[in-house]
Design a protein with these regions (language model features):
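Residue-level detector of the transmembrane beta-barrel scaffold of outer-membrane proteins
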Residues: 175-177, 210, 331-333, 347, ...
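Outer-membrane beta-barrel translocator/channel fold
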Residues: 367-450
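Juxtacatalytic substrate-recognition/specificity segment
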Residues: 1-76, 80-88, 92, 146, ...
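Amphipathic alpha-helical substructures
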Residues: 14-15, 142-143, 147-231
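Beta-strand-rich binding/interaction modules
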Residues: 17-18, 174, 207-208, 221-288
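Acidic/His/Gly-enriched intrinsically disordered linker/tail segments
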Residues: 72, 76-160
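Outer-membrane beta-barrel initiation region
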Residues: 265, 275-276, 287-391, 429-432, ...
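Active-site-adjacent bridging/hinge elements
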Residues: 28-32, 51-61, 127-142, 324-326
């Protein structure tokens, strides 16, 4: 099935034999599957073998038959491999979750990490680096990429980007272009320029943005609604391009979760006002199915029902979870501390630190001092600001505070404002980094008779 799938999607393999070995897989594993301990088996042995074989076969298939510069055009190898893997999963395992059978546990039903689809994980791995401001342009030479980007983040975003272009162009323009590109490769050595030329010849749409922005730059994508007005029959809304990255974006209308309309907003239309038939929609959403590898999905929703619609309701989650753009997640964890003057201090920690970094985080931990019979605890707030095109790549502003007792009849309040400036070398592979830390510690102590 995998052999036939690759031949139909990409083109007939030109050699008589292809070797697919365990050693090849171990050199280039499927990250996520290979991180699971042996005693956890969320997937059947048959499925694991199928996915491992699919990844390794596609890798060997492309590397031994596609004549590309492995440094300059490595993103094409990666993009075609991941795009093919996602397409294979859509066709053969459309309902498989990222967590496999673990997703069926009732205890985990409320967790986003247990509910996202198998193909959704690619976007999260890319976001892991983008939110840390460590992502790199897909078109950068392979020897300039940091290891995580080379093996995971850039590889996955390459596949997501080709899938995005496929969804935007429609009419099988991308699959047809892949076949033409592969066939042309049998005649001569091909390059990114040939791939670009073939893609442009198969569509009437302007796709210069795909190569100029998606492939050749680190530009991030973030759209949001600025205003929404509704009537019984129509919706009028404005869209803001927050990062000024000229990329088309799809808008959806949904009714009770079912899609009632979808429309692509082209580059020249963004930062504009649109009016669409409502078709009974109770919500409009940008990039609903994450076709566009967007930096921030949390501001893509607008409810149309209710006098004061709550676009993202609060959701309480125990311990930890993956970021869920549908909700304002508050994670809670029971806590317990001890010191001589407060005694045992049970409490509860409330925070919003999901697996992906966020621009604003809070961490509140109220507790009860059993010895002094008073409230105590800790609290912190932080604002994280990334600078995309500077050696000063991150500034973090934070303030934290704690309140406890230092004597049996006296407490202290500590307030700690802080600014951290992180500086890196222009070469991302250079591990040298500098940290400038500005901090003030303010302590207010009650007087003690002891």
């Amino acid at each position: 099935r995998i052999v036939n799938f690759a031949n139909e999607l990409i083109g007939k393999y030109p050699h008589e034999k292809i070797i697919v070995s365990q050693t090849d897989y171990e050199r280039n594993p499927f990250y996520g599957l290979n991180q699971l301990p042996s005693f956890i088996s969320p997937f059947s042995d048959e499925f694991l073998f199928e996915i491992k074989f699919l990844k390794t076969y596609l890798n060997e298939y492309l590397k031994t038959s596609l004549q590309l510069d492995p440094r300059k055009d490595n993103w094409i190898y990666d993009g075609l491999q991941v795009y093919a893997m996602m397409k294979y999963m859509d066709e053969n395992h459309p309902n498989t979750k990222m967590m496999g059978s673990v997703s069926n546990l009732r205890l985990l039903k409320s967790y986003n990490i247990a509910n996202i689809g198998f193909n959704d994980q690619y976007s999260y791995f890319y976001m892991l680096m983008a939110r840390k401001n460590l992502d790199q342009a897909l078109g950068d030479p392979k020897n300039t990429l940091i290891k995580f980007n080379e093996q995971i983040a850039s590889k996955y975003r390459s596949g997501l980007s080709i899938r995005f272009l496929d969804d935007y162009l429609q009419n099988d323009a991308v699959p047809a272009s892949i076949k033409q590109f592969y066939n042309q490769n049998q005649i001569k050595q091909v390059s990114r320029t040939d791939f670009e030329t073939i893609l442009k010849s198969n569509t009437d749409k302007d796709i210069n943005w795909f190569f100029n922005t998606i492939i050749n730059s680190r530009a991030i994508i973030d759209y949001k609604f600025s205003s929404v007005k509704k009537t019984k029959d129509s919706i009028t809304f404005s869209v803001i391009n927050k990062t000024e990255t000229p990329i088309p974006i799809p808008v959806y209308g949904t009714k009770k979760g079912a899609v009632v309309f979808k429309q692509w907003l082209d580059i020249e239309e963004c930062d504009s006002t649109f009016t669409f038939p409502r078709n009974g929609a109770d919500k409009i959403i940008l990039n609903l199915k994450n076709e566009v590898p967007e930096y921030n999905l949390r501001n893509n929703w607008k409810k149309l029902d209710g006098f004061f619609p709550n676009n993202r309701p609060v959701k309480f989650v125990f311990l930890k979870d993956l970021e869920d753009p549908y909700y304002n997640q508050v994670l809670y964890v029971p806590s317990i501390y001890y010191n001589l003057y407060d005694g045992i201090t049970p409490g509860i920690r409330l925070h919003n630190k999901t697996i992906l970094d966020k621009p604003f985080t809070f961490d509140i931990n109220p507790s009860y001092s059993t010895k002094s019979n008073n409230l105590s605890g800790l609290v912190s707030f932080a604002v994280n600001q990334n600078y995309r095109n500077s050696t000063l790549y991150n500034v973090k502003y934070s303030v934290s505070s704690s309140y406890f007792h230092y004597a049996q009849d006296a407490s202290y309040l500590r307030i700690n404002p802080m600014v951290q400036l992180r500086i890196r070398e222009p070469n991302f592979r250079d591990n040298r980094k500098q940290l400038i830390l500005l901090r003030q510690v303010i302590v207010n102590k009650e007087k003690s008779a002891f």
